[in-house]
Amino acid sequence: MSNEMKAGQDFLAANATKEGVIVTASGLQYRVMKSGQGATPGPTDVVMAHYHGTFIDGKVFDSSVERGEPLALPVNGVISGWTEALQMMQEGDQWQLFVPSDLAYGARGVGPIPGNTALIFEVELIEVK
């Protein structure tokens, strides 16, 4: 087992016990930071979202918030942890997602993200298009 995978598993095991953290059947963890009132997207919808992505040590790897530009994202064209979460969210929701590596980029990684890495995202669902 890689160091990244072990660190992610240890982090997620501890995180799952924290107040307000919900764990889904897939292993995705989330915490509702703010509740919205709007529409919930389906798998073929496109959403406008802001996000802030960090490693479990808090280091930022990508952030639409820092760029000041929300992104249009196809619900079924993002990592599977996001696809699952977005379909449970409503417009106006802000959630913190704790994504196991198998629901993120898996063993291959991508760009600055090594393989087998658990990731944390703060996601604001702005609009279902």
Which stretches of residues belong to each language-model region?
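Cross-family detector of peptidyl-prolyl cis-trans isomerase
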Residues: 1-129
